[in-house]
Amino acid sequence: CDRRQRQMCIRDREWLVNFKNETHNHPTEIEPFGGAATCLGGAIRDPLSGRTYVYQAMRVTGAADPTVPVSQTIEGKLPQKKLVREAAHGYSSYGNQIGLATGYVKEVYHPNYVAKRMEIGAVMGAAPRRAVQRLNSDPGDKIILLGGRTGRDGIGGATGSSKAHNTKSTSVCGAEVQKGNAPTERKLQRLFRREEVSHIIKKCNDFGAGGVSVAIGELADGLRIELD
């Protein structure tokens, strides 16, 4: 299509639209910057694995009164002021790095959120229907791991949200929150947006906190992995 016809061509195409929301209440509670950043990054990953391009986002949060003096912080908790400020910085940082506009932000304040913060990120993605295929795997198909470096946080990071915590946990548990890599995820978005790339992919999973056993294990009934 030329420029004058482009708008009409877009209307005439069949499109796939993905909606995804992600809650990062616990990660943001223990490490607010990283927890909120990877809330957005994790929400983007799922539509990306479906080969759709994420183009808009929404953020909804819940916190107790951030003006309460730090001296009144409950033992074992981070101050509400720290949670509110650093979570906002983390979410914004990731969005700015990856180039995603958040068109709607809602902050809810209620005393009950002192028990645990609410951090929700939601996104929408879209791709031309002709660019995406979802097929069963066949013998001889290749599995490719593509993306940034994955450390121990990306292999077993999800376990941190399931174990018991106490008043001393906040001194060490922040390290369990996964570290985001927005520039690399941005490169993957741009790669998958190319139809000649997207169209040759039969199946795709995002490499979440469940690690390689989940991301690869779901692709076929049986497979061989040579992982260095």
Region annotations inferred by a language model:
Residues C1-I10:
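Single conserved hydrophobic/aromatic residue that forms the stacking wall/gate
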Residues E22-T28, G62-E75, G160-K179, R194-H199, ...:
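Gly-rich Lys/Arg/Thr-decorated short loops/hinges at beta-loop-alpha junctions or inter-strand turns
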Residues K116, G208-D228:
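Glycine-/charge-enriched secondary-structure boundary and capping motifs
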Residues E119-R129:
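Short, structured beta-strand/loop micro-motifs enriched in basic residues and often containing a Trp
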Residues P128-T150:
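Acidic/histidine-enriched ion/cofactor-binding microenvironments in catalytic or ligand-binding pockets
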Residues G148-G160:
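Short, Lys/Arg- and Gly-enriched loop/turn segments at beta-strand edges
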